[in-house]
Curated annotation (Swiss-Prot):
It comes from Mus musculus. Belongs to the HSBP1 family. GO terms for molecular function: transcription corepressor activity. Pfam families: HSBP1. This is Heat shock factor-binding protein 1-like protein 1. The lineage of its organism: Eukaryota, Metazoa, Chordata, Craniata, Vertebrata.
Length: 72
């Protein structure tokens, strides 16, 4: 008795197509992750700049900063 699984017509082609699709999705996901990380870093820098500008304006206006930032 033959215990091998029956050959599926075009099975190898389908498997290759699925593997290629998964690799392509993985590449796109990695590119998106990289882009999002860069944009988050840029946003963090902009927020820090904004906080410094607000602090400077408050100092110029003679207003004490009542909200203290945690030390980093």
């Amino acid at each position: 008795m033959d215990t091998r699984t029956p050959e599926v017509p075009c099975g190898d082609l389908l498997q290759n197509a699925a593997e290629n699709l998964l690799l392509e999705v993985e590449e796109h996901f990695q590119a998106l992750t990289t882009t999002l990380n860069l944009r988050m870093e840029e946003m963090g820098s902009r927020i820090e700049d904004l906080q410094r500008n607000v602090d400077d304006l408050m100092t110029q206006a003679g207003i004490e900063n009542s909200i203290k930032e945690p030390a980093t």
